[in-house]
Amino acid sequence: MLAAVASFLDARKQGGQWLLRVEDIDPPREQPGASDEILTALDCYGFEWDGPVTYQSASREAHDEAIKALLEAGKAYRCGCSRRDLATAPRGSLGVIYPGTCRARCDATEAALRVLTDDKSVSFDDRLQGHQEQCLETESGDFIVHRRDGLIAYQLAVVVDDHLQGITDIVRGIDLMDSTPRQIWLQLLLGYATPAYCHIPVAINDRGQKLSKSHGTKRVPLDQPERMLFAALQTLGQHPPAELNSAGLADIWAWALDNWNIQVLNAQTEIIPFLNALAETENGLS
């Protein structure tokens, strides 16, 4: 919810478009009806997106073309390693650091595809979190772009789709910042422009846990959008006037658009929701 509010307001404040894309490339993990629930909630809260809703699964041909380009350029290779094979591999903040086992050769019948990394740091300047650097070779190793089960990996899909849609600015939760260097690396290999990145702090509960389904948070309520939007603005440090707490959605959005200032979140990584109801809400719109 917070990332949706922040990205929407930031796009509008800069005179840009706010595009809505459903990431539906992992059917085994998708819950039936989840996408429709999110769209219903966004509409209920008064979000207005530009153009039609797009679905990541509709871009499969473009994803495959990107994979083909990486293979033809010698930037990707087949990998037959299983989780068991990598059980003794070193681990870092991003998980297993792939040791390059299949770089030279892979004889497996079924294989994933990994993209080559090197020892150069990938860097970017985040609008809120400042300068960031990551050496992919030592922190993640060569990473998967096409899974053994035939599905496209998220890192590649989101990069291709951002390129297809002409995305220039990305505002999202800081829990996704570790993915950014891998996405920038793919942009460089594929010759894509790199968007400007802005990672907002994630909401946590009173135990310091990120709000998520795994920690018992609930769906975004549809019966009190005004109250929840007001609380979201407070949580994002925007200080809406008290009288807006009893105002309609249109008035709350109008104030938010006039007064939006994302820089009040500068360098923050965690925030605690102002409203108990918001603290109990899952981060499903981020």
Model-identified regions with their sequence ranges:
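Noncatalytic linker/hinge segments flanking ATPase motor cores
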Residues: 59-64, 155-156, 160, 200-201, ...
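Non-catalytic terminal extensions that flank enzyme cores
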Residues: 13, 107, 120, 209-286
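N-terminal Rossmann-like or analogous alpha/beta NTP/dinucleotide-binding catalytic cores
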Residues: 1-91, 174-175, 179-192, 244-249, ...
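Bulky hydrophobic/aromatic packing residues
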Residues: 4, 8, 18-19, 25, ...
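Active-site cores that bind ATP or allylic diphosphates and position pyrophosphate for catalysis
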Residues: 78, 83-222, 240, 277-286
